[in-house]
A protein has these predicted regions:
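Domain-terminus/edge residues, biased toward the C-terminal soluble/receptor-binding domains
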Residues: 153-154, 167-170, 174-407, 419, ...
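Sec-dependent N-terminal signal peptides of Gram-positive bacterial secreted proteins and lipoproteins
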Residues: 4-22, 404-423
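Boundary segments of small protein-protein interaction reader/adaptor domains
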Residues: 90-93, 430-436
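Periplasmic/cell-envelope proteins involved in peptidoglycan metabolism and beta-lactam response
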Residues: 145-148, 426, 434-435
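Active-site-adjacent loops and short helices of periplasmic peptidoglycan-processing enzymes
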Residues: 21-174, 178-187
């Protein structure tokens, strides 16, 4: 019997080793999907089902708050919003989180922002959507989806600004991580997102009582058994359909990470999984690696004035990447992603794409950064006497979806390596909306 038990334990140990040997990312997580991302570059460090379309619940509000901060541009003083009938009564029967806003109430913008963030107020989210959506919640939702498109995200569609579950309201862990990256660039957002202290909302024209909003995320409360000191800011979410969702910004020893988990069945599962993911990432990714420019160049035609003006040069800029221990600059390749032509008056969409080939040490994935464009000023000066059409007069070739990618497999460790340049033409497929996965 003892020999049988010993053999069984040995077999189980070998099985566990085999299961974990080829995987990139921590074992023993229960969440349906997760994504760990470098907050600075957007490089994915570890993931599971990161593109699966799931109900987000209240982490939806990251986009809502980001757009409100974008509109305000840090100017909150003296800005008051008036609560509409729809802000309040569209939530009737939902039994959802709120801050007891009343129709006709005049609410300072700052109070609406903190109420939506800290108290996860759905009425506050509606009010903010009207603020950046031209006066209607529907306009706010349209703005949210427009921002999704602007960020190039393919697995997100919003139907409301607060996150109450619906079949046409979904996102993915990867998309939500990118939404938070974008939101962190908006004036004032990080201040709101990282606030830990209780927030006090003074009485208003129709509410005579003072309202208090306190932090609910136990992973940010020092007295909690689930406390994680590295987490600087977070948004939690829950509905019966979505279960538990979570997005956070964490920082340790100068490394800034975004962690997203979705569809954790139990609250304690979420706590344990987030700790596991952050412990894994901070232990494995301890510092940044500077990759200088590899001197990779390409050319793009400039169109204006009814014809081609000439060409400009595009170069890879170099990048600072978060690489796992054991992964080096020699494991990174770079390519250029260029439009067929650049039309004056549009944004020059020229990118360097850095791909990490991490093997079993790091998620093999890519990150796009703006490339360096030179020669445009000289080209414009050479055509100074010519009446130049702008984007409104010339149809960009990019609308056909054609890209030219000039790729270079570069090895940093071999300075004199042969450079292999190849031109690849590919069509960008039109995105089709996918059905929600339950």
């Amino acid at each position: 019997m003892k020999k049988y038990i010993a053999a069984l334990l040995t077999a189980l140990l070998l099985l566990c080793t085999a299961l974990s040997a080829g995987a990139v990312g921590p074992a023993l997580t229960t969440t349906e999907a997760y994504c760990i991302m470098d907050a600075d570059t957007g490089l994915v460090l570890a993931q599971q089902n990161m593109n699966e379309e799931l109900h987000p619940a209240s982490i939806t509000k990251v986009m809502t708050l980001g757009l409100a901060c974008q509109k305000a541009q840090g100017n909150w003083d003296g800005v008051k919003l008036t609560v509409s009938h729809e802000d309040v009564y569209s939530l009737a029967g939902t039994d959802s989180s709120h801050i007891a806003l009343r129709e006709g109430e005049e609410v300072p913008l700052q109070d609406a922002l903190y109420g939506t963030m800290i108290a996860s107020a759905n009425d506050g989210a509606n009010l903010l959507a009207e603020y950046f959506g031209g006066g209607t919640i529907e306009g706010g939702v349209a703005a949210m989806n427009a921002q999704v498109q602007a960020l190039g995200l393919e697995h997100t569609h919003f139907a409301n600004p607060h996150g109450i579950s619906g079949n046409d309201h979904y996102t993915s862990c990867y998309d939500m991580a990118q939404i938070l990256r974008w939101a962190l660039t908006q004036p004032g957002f990080e201040t709101i997102f990282t606030r830990l202290e209780m927030y006090t909302m003074a009485p208003t024209n129709v509410q005579p009582v003072t309202r208090y909003f306190s932090q609910q995320d136990k992973m940010r409360l020092s007295y909690s058994r689930y406390y994680i000191p590295a987490i600087r800011g977070s948004k939690i979410g829950y509905t019966n359909i979505a279960r538990y969702s979570y997005v956070c910004l964490a920082e340790q020893n100068g490394v800034r990470l975004i962690c997203v988990t979705m569809q954790s069945e139990m609250k304690t599962d979420k706590y344990n999984d987030v700790r596991t993911l952050l412990d894994y990432a901070f232990a494995r990714y301890t510092g940044y690696t500077d990759l200088p420019s590899q001197g990779l160049t390409g050319e793009v035609e400039v169109v204006g004035g009814g014809g081609t003006l000439g060409k400009v040069t595009v170069t890879d800029p170099g990048v600072r990447l978060l690489l796992a221990d054991g992964v080096t600059a020699g494991d990174v390749s770079v390519s250029l992603e260029l439009p067929e032509r650049y039309v004056l008056g549009t944004s020059p969409e020229v990118y360097a794409v850095y791909t990490v080939n991490g093997g079993d040490k790091q998620e093999s994935t890519s990150v796009r950064v703006p490339a360096v464009l030179t020669g445009l000023d000289a080209l414009l000066e050479a055509n100074a006497g010519r009446e130049l059409d702008t984007a409104s007069d010339v149809k960009p070739a990019r609308t056909a979806g054609m890209l030219i990618a000039i790729s270079l497999a570069c090895t940093a460790a071999t300075a004199g390596a042969t450079l292999c340049v190849m031109r690849v033409m590919r069509l960008r497929k039109t995105k089709k909306q996918k059905p929600l996965k339950h």
